[in-house]
UniProtKB/Swiss-Prot annotation:
Protein task: Component of a nucleolar small nuclear ribonucleoprotein particle (snoRNP) thought to participate in the processing and modification of pre-ribosomal RNA (pre-rRNA). Part of the small subunit (SSU) processome, first precursor of the small eukaryotic ribosomal subunit. During the assembly of the SSU processome in the nucleolus, many ribosome biogenesis factors, an RNA chaperone and ribosomal proteins associate with the nascent pre-rRNA and work in concert to generate RNA folding, modifications, rearrangements and cleavage as well as targeted degradation of pre-ribosomal RNA by the RNA exosome.
Gene: Rrp9
The name this protein goes by in its record: U3 small nucleolar RNA-interacting protein 2
Composition bias type Acidic residues, residue spans: 65-74
PANTHER family hit by this protein: U3 SMALL NUCLEOLAR RNA INTERACTING PROTEIN 2, U3 SMALL NUCLEOLAR RNA-INTERACTING PROTEIN 2
One GO term (biological process): rRNA processing
Organism: Mus musculus (Mouse)
Amino acid sequence: MSTAVATRKRAKPAPGPGAAPVAGKRRRKVDSAADRGKSKGGGKMNEEISSDSESESLAPRKTEEEEEEELEETAQEKKLRLAKLYLEQLRQQEEEKAEARAFEEDQVAGRLKEDVLEQRGRLQKSVAKEIQAPAPTDIRVLRGHQLSITCLVITPDDLAIFSAAKDCTIIKWSVETGRKLHVIPRAKKGAQGQPAGHSSHVLCMAISSDGKYLASGDRSKLILIWEAQSCQHLYTFTGHRDAVSGLAFRKGTHQLYSTSHDRSVKVWNAAENSYVETLFGHQDAVAALDALSRECCVTAGGRDGTVRVWKIPEESQLVFYGHQGSIDCIHLINEEHMVSGADDGSVALWGLSKKRPLALQREAHGLHGEPGLEQPFWVSSVAALLNTDLVATGSHNARVRLWQCGEGFRQLDPLCDIPLVGFINSLKFSSAGDFLVAGVGQEHRLGRWWRIKEARNSVCIIPLRRLPVSPVAGS
């Protein structure tokens, strides 16, 4: 009995919930024995036992508290990183706002400077160097008149062109499509009542700066006022005693200036259908007239060889000399400077404070004729892009020439030539400066000294491609 009890193995109690498993202890003992055995014999088994299982057993185990602490620190770091990122974004936004404010202030300052220079008549934007000569295939030709084009105007929104000719008609064209929008036909002579059209050569036109009124003048001494949108005739101004050769609206108003071969300058109010006053001073037929915002106008005196500035309120005039021939065309560049052309082939730049030209370009379009008898090509039209240094001139030498005015308008340099056959009787820049319109005829607008048979009576739209306008420079 005692022997049986001594040989029987005592049952081991089951491990408690917190006790380490016994198998683990045995495994470690077995592993240790195996290590000892293999360390003596070497071999493949030694490599397997010294791998992951051993490293895992030797690596310190992280408690749950340590893991939670690590996770908690990571969240804090994330919050800190997001906070720094948010602050950086705020800083960048404030910098951008500051840059935008500075840019707006610069823009406002630049605009104010432009306004001051414009009011003083000294604004000169530099655009001429950026103009690229168009290819002949880019020029659009609009045909509809039977005789030579004499004058044209562009609406203030640059969407339509009015052209007039020796055939006594006026045509309104679409700039975009080139189609006729309206035709004002020739009026029959002797028709009873007020004719809704011209019965003689239309020599000049003008459109108000709001695009409401169109004025046209002819050889029969009449000025007709039209509603520009519908081309409906409104009324007729009479009073000139010879052909009406120049018309211009004062910018921002409905005050109309007219000039005539009767040597006078008249002032009208188109909105009120009224005559205001007449000014005298020229000694020969006046050929052309122009005006801007000031209550004054400039005239080209033809054979009397003078350019005159008329101060309407003071009823006074300034007289300028410089050309040697008949001054046939004139155009204001800004309130203080103008350009004129004459039949002696010269183009002149003027400042209102100087009685002589600031710059004079002789033989601006070259010479023609037999050797020893050469004569300069007449300058039949001039145009200027408002408040810039870009000028265009026309003649009958088969080209329109673009010019750059130097600083202070003291120099005139040629830029490029645009091929157009015929008399260039009228030139106008669009207000945006993206195209130039030329009125071409077989004859000069004021006579029939030559006839160019190969020319086509037409309106030509010349695209002007250029880089963005450079910063403003005032003289």
